[in-house]
């Protein structure tokens, strides 16, 4: 996916996209810097996300982002309700030490930091902010709060933030995550600040509450 995502604008418009120019138009975390994408239906039942180490239940049908060319970052998966320009939910399902949230060219001047298993919540949120700025095209990003929150039976965190992108649209997000046995588990919602964030927040909270660790 291209945009960001988890994990925020890194995908694209509703059907397919190619190239880094689409980065500022989407809300998602994983994926590569090139390739085409499509969507599949997520039904209201328990489903595994990412590489299968976490499962959740959506309160209503969602669209799961899939790649046609080039493989996804297996630990990261993205959903949308109204299209990635308006809203997105990203899942990181047990990312191991030294792994990336998004595939990157090694020759790129700016790099999103890799996850480290000893990262603190402030360091994880700094990694996510870097994803938004470097790959998502955010021109301004503000942390609204960072606080402890239980997640998957562990001591986790909740990060609330908002960002202005190159398309001049303010978006707001919330990430809930924890590092368990050295792996990052995280669910992130990012949506247009006007209407879409508040409308989708109850869905996000229901999905977070339903999350189960399988790996």
Residue ranges of each PLM-predicted region?
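Acidic/histidine-rich, surface-exposed loop or edge segments in extracytoplasmic proteins
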Residues: 97-112
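Short intrinsically disordered coil segments
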Residues: 107-108, 176, 204
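Second-shell loop/turn segments in exported
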Residues: 110-118, 193-198
């Amino acid at each position: 996916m291209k945009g960001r995502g988890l994990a925020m604008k890194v995908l694209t418009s509703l059907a397919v996209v190619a190239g880094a120019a689409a980065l500022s138009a989407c809300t998602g975390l994983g994926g590569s810097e090139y390739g085409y994408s499509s969507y599949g239906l997520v039904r209201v039942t328990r489903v595994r996300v990412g590489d299968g180490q976490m499962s959740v239940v959506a309160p209503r049908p969602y669209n799961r982002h899939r790649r046609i060319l080039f493989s996804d970052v297996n630990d990261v998966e993205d959903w949308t309700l109204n299209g990635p320009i308006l809203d997105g939910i990203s899942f990181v399902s047990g990312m191991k030490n030294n792994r990336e949230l998004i595939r990157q060219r090694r020759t790129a001047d700016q790099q999103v930091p890799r996850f480290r298993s000893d990262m603190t919540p402030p360091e994880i949120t700094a990694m996510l902010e870097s994803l938004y700025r470097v790959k998502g095209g955010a021109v301004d990003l503000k942390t609204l709060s960072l606080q402890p929150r239980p997640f998957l039976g562990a001591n986790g965190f909740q990060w609330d933030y908002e960002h202005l992108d190159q398309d001049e649209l303010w978006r707001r997000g919330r990430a809930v995550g924890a590092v368990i046995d050295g792996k990052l588990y995280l669910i992130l919602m990012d949506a247009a600040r006007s209407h879409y964030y508040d409308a989708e927040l109850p869905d996000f909270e229901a999905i977070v509450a339903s999350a189960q660790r399988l790996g």
